[in-house]
Amino acid sequence: MINGERSIERPLRWGMVGGGRTGQVGYKHRTGAQRDGTYRLVCGAFDLDAERGRDFGTKIGVAADRCYGDFKELIAKEAGREDGVEVVSIATPNFTHYEITKACLEAGLHVICEKPLFFTVAECEEVARLAEEKGLIVGVTYGFTGHPLVHQMAAMVKKGMLGDIRIVDMQYTHGFNAGDDVGAGEAVKWRTNPKTAGPTFVLGDIGTHLYYLSEVVLPHIKIEKLLCDRKAFIPTRAPLEDHATVLMHYDNGARGRLWVSSVNAGNMGSQRYRFVGSKASIEWSDSHPDQLIYEVQGEPNRTLHHGMPYLEEESLACDRMGALHTEGLGDSWANIYLWIAQSIDAKRRGDEAFLRDHHYPGIQAGTEGVRWLENCVRSADAGSAWVEFN
């Protein structure tokens, strides 16, 4: 169980690019990063509007002279300080991720980036090589995989409690884009523009969360081929999609279905995962993150609760509140940030053995998410044809 004791040598000097007053995810990053005393926010380029960013930064405790106008100024000026920033979080629109990440790595800074990581696998692989050459960590904020019961599911699968995996069924939907985009805010505009969002809308924005979580739970099976059907129900969003279904064939013979939509009218936002094996099934939803349904064929269904001693150690190790109290998304983000901090600390100490065994969403996870998106787009653009996953 996590109790807030600092698990690294000292707090990391941390900065942010984006995530300011008008951003949607900045607060999630800050509360996650600062929960366990592993990061100390020392600087930021929080906003395209430099004055607004400076005003925001000072109001969250950053010195005015370390609130910069853009990421280039941040990198240049922090490099000249003995107490300069060591790790930078990137909470900006998709099209900026590659340039900012590469610049930070070239300056010797670790990076924590929003997903989807970049536009192409080629960009991901280039940056992965750069990070390896520089001896730096790149983390990706797949923020839902810090929930303790996600790791309970992975442990149950690993122990064979489900038997052979047969069916993978996942959805992440909401209805907040069910209407047209007249009067829509900037967050909607950039997400539905291929120049700023990349080749997908909901597949990249929310579908990659499903894909990565399934990789955490089912690391031993891989997609062999897939079929993607995507559609823009609001025509102005085309060629990007606001709804998509992906069918997947796995190398062990399992079948998968993934549904993502931002036009599921009336739905406030929900993720659901069901993993079916030859012996039993498990089902988990982020709407009830403290509960995991475990169904064994021929037996009464069981509801497993977070923090209980009957759970696997992998789950209990990332629990924060204990069984008496609920855990939420903020706790999950805190775990992600903690695991990345521990990885940065290990990299700094040269502890490669720790890094080999330590789970965190890194650049390989980000790369595989982009690879999945590339295959989805290739299938959809071929008339929703089956394509080999490569």
Language-model features: where?
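A structured beta-alpha segment of the ubiquitous adenosine-cofactor-binding alpha/beta core
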Residues: 66-85
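Predominantly a Rossmann-like dinucleotide-binding segment in NAD(P)-dependent oxidoreductases
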Residues: 137, 144-238, 292, 383
